[in-house]
From Swiss-Prot:
Pfam family membership, one: MFS_1
Organism: Homo sapiens
Major localisation: membrane
Gene Ontology CC annotation, any one: membrane
Protein name: Solute carrier family 49 member A3
Keyword Metal-binding: no
Keywords recorded for this protein, A-Z: Membrane, Transmembrane, Transmembrane helix, Transport
Biased composition (Gly residues): 466-481
Transmembrane region(s): 30-50, 70-90, 100-120, 125-145, 166-186, 192-212, 250-270, 282-302, 318-338, 341-361, 379-399, 422-442
Any one GO molecular-function label of the UniProt entry: transmembrane transporter activity
Localisation: Membrane
Region forming the signal peptide: none
Gene: SLC49A3
UniProt topology in membrane: Multi-pass membrane protein
Amino acid sequence: MAGPTEAETGLAEPRALCAQRGHRTYARRWVFLLAISLLNCSNATLWLSFAPVADVIAEDLVLSMEQINWLSLVYLVVSTPFGVAAIWILDSVGLRAATILGAWLNFAGSVLRMVPCMVVGTQNPFAFLMGGQSLCALAQSLVIFSPAKLAALWFPEHQRATANMLATMSNPLGVLVANVLSPVLVKKGEDIPLMLGVYTIPAGVVCLLSTICLWESVPPTPPSAGAASSTSEKFLDGLKLQLMWNKAYVILAVCLGGMIGISASFSALLEQILCASGHSSGFSGLCGALFITFGILGALALGPYVDRTKHFTEATKIGLCLFSLACVPFALVSQLQGQTLALAATCSLLGLFGFSVGPVAMELAVECSFPVGEGAATGMIFVLGQAEGILIMLAMTALTVRRSEPSLSTCQQGEDPLDWTVSLLLMAGLCTFFSCILAVFFHTPYRRLQAESGEPPSTRNAVGGADSGPGVDRGGAGRAGVLGPSTATPECTARGASLEDPRGPGSPHPACHRATPRAQGPAATDAPSRPGRLAGRVQASRFIDPAGSHSSFSSPWVIT
């Protein structure tokens, strides 16, 4: 199906792609989206399958609550160091390879968790559970960064935010499934094998789907001008020259990473927090389900809205500020007994304001850091979020104290009920801090949209007016970290598609030197169709015209 023309969309296209192929979308992009969405959902169910029934698991397997917490915390621990490697795989090896590898790791981890139930007399079942969770955590590192990459490579500009939303929100959908399904499946210790088996089935299905149905990392023809230049910097170059020096990106990464860490800690500890106030594991699962459900509903409304309006910054700031406001009443109400309606309402608001802005914030990260690869731009935020999540979760559990007064606790028998008041106030304070920093200090141009529309790129970081760093030139169009205008000059247009120089046959016309550059070397014409070939370096290079001749014009935009 042919994509919209430049006249219809108002998007300026790279000269070479426009002259040779144009932009095109493929129906199989929806298969790729389905595979990544199912994989994200399955991985999330495996992550939190134990948390909603922590007391039953601990009692039947003779484990402490600290060990149960580590079955969830291991995701954060493993994802932090291996997340960097996963970003490199995603941007350098390719989206298809990363997805298939993640699917197999996810399936292997789900099977390993079942060993204590399938083999009678297994010694130390916790080791098998932890090993399986660790493999699933490795899979998460590969797939949780994929939605923004998939949206950029396979979807046109007017569908990117929606595609990113669908793939990203499949992860909290998995959390929702775990919160609802685990308490339903596990009523007593004998039900644990059933729960583990049920969660293995979707992992096997998505493994088969990814292996058979995913054929290539990138489409033969890019769907947009931004896709044609996607991942134009190598991972280490983008990290050193752009992300670390881009003040707007650093602020977004720290604040959004903190919110990710808070959400992860909230989901993992919710059952323990509410059981201390006398609420059942079933009600805790309901609150977790409301948290995710309203987040998904909010994202379904916010994704198409941002696709139309491009209000990435406004939506992110408003959503996270409202999320912080909802954290305060939850910190207070959750420690009171009998406040079921108020708890359900606050959990719903937390999901509506917090989870719903996740996909939009990931798109904002790509816009803020362009031309850095989508995997690196979003992946570093998730890695930072996992690291912050470890610290927040450890701090919240460390700040709990034993209740001295009588309580109606429904927590595991044999353990004193805990008081989570200080821990929850810490969570609310951190939410407020991160949202205020983001609202006041974060400002950025939309660099990818500027590149696609052919507008003169912004050469200065909007935060304090400081330069974005050594990776951003202070020159004119086409030299400031985004693609320059791709509209050819009248003289260039008059020469036709061959663009030959009157000074000699086969040479690009000098009037076209400002057009969007093409890739260097023989691989230029097929770079978009080869998995992993979009991972390239920002460097000086020569243009190649359709006839294959060279010009000495240098450009910072080359895909090698």
